[in-house]
From Swiss-Prot:
Cofactors required: Mg(2+)
Gene3D superfamilies: 1.10.720.60, HAD superfamily/HAD-like (3.40.50.1000)
Organism expressing this protein natively: Botryotinia fuckeliana (strain B05.10) (Noble rot fungus)
UniProt name for this protein: Enolase-phosphatase E1
Enzyme class: hydrolase
């Protein structure tokens, strides 16, 4: 492995990278839509639901019907609005806890995460899904509860928890913006320089943004993902499995 660049932090996309796009599009999204009417009927005024309802624009949160109509419209357009993503996470909770929902990881994901973690590298997540939804997904996978694989932050000298390993469009910004990756790396600068980060995603525009920020970044090619054109492939590293990552870099960190 001599001569390969070293990576201390691996930043992972979720949909189309660690699990099939179909799990999100064909299972999670329909589940949320199906669960929403009953939730609105039984929990509209409940303290637990109020924060999610209040996050919606007032004109769309005046009645259960107005909120339901707005959610259907947003999801039909596949818009990644933070208040929608937060609500979806809330709706998925019951499905995960009941066993109806379980994230089907690609078979190469868990072995790679375990190896990288055991080598001292830190693993972080960056997804358009809310941080709460990300934690649910990693808790309920086909490989069991894998939250221990994800870096969960440090404590400062005053005991205050510093920025951790889960990032979304609220605490980081939009995924196709260079500044979002700069923010993530800066917030976790204790883990390594930005050039020691590797971002893995199926989205070419996200990969380019991460590279512009100074990170290493590879395009993950999976069955069911959009085809990567010849033009898009130019200048990019493509991997079809996490097992291929270490053909290009050494994922490890100094150990005490």
């Amino acid at each position: 492995m001599e001569g390969k660049p070293r990576v201390k932090v691996v930043l992972l996309d979720i949909e189309g990278t660690v699990c099939p796009i179909s799990f999100v599009k064909d299972i999670l999204f329909p589940y949320a839509l199906a669960a929403l009417p009953e939730t609105l009927s039984t929990q509209w005024d409940s303290p637990s639901f109020l924060p999610y309802r209040s996050a919606f624009p007032p004109e769309h949160a005046s009645t259960p019907d107005a909120l339901l109509s707005h959610v259907r419209d947003l999801m039909a357009q596949d818009l990644k609005i933070p208040y929608l993503k937060s609500l979806q996470g809330y709706l998925w909770l019951r499905g995960y806890e009941s066993g109806e929902l379980k994230c089907p990881l690609f078979p190469d994901v868990y072995p790679a995460l375990k190896k990288w973690r055991d080598n001292g590298a830190k693993i972080c997540i960056y997804s358009s899904g809310s941080v709460a939804a990300q934690k649910l997904l990693w808790r309920y996978t086909t490989e069991g509860d894998l939250r221990s694989c994800i870096w969960n932050g440090l404590e400062g000298d005053d005991g205050r928890e510093l920025e951790g390993g889960y990032w979304d469009t609220v605490n980081a910004g939009l995924k196709q913006h260079m500044a979002s990756y700069e923010k993530i790396a800066k917030a976790n600068s204790a883990l390594g320089e930005v050039g020691e980060w590797l971002f893995l995603s199926d989205n070419i525009k996200e990969v380019r943004a991460a590279r512009e920020a100074g990170m290493k970044s590879f395009v993950v090619v999976r069955e069911g993902n959009a085809e990567v054109t010849a033009e898009e492939r130019e200048g990019q590293v493509l991997v079809e499995s996490f097992a291929e990552v270490e053909k290009w870099v050494e994922v490890t960190a100094d150990k005490a």
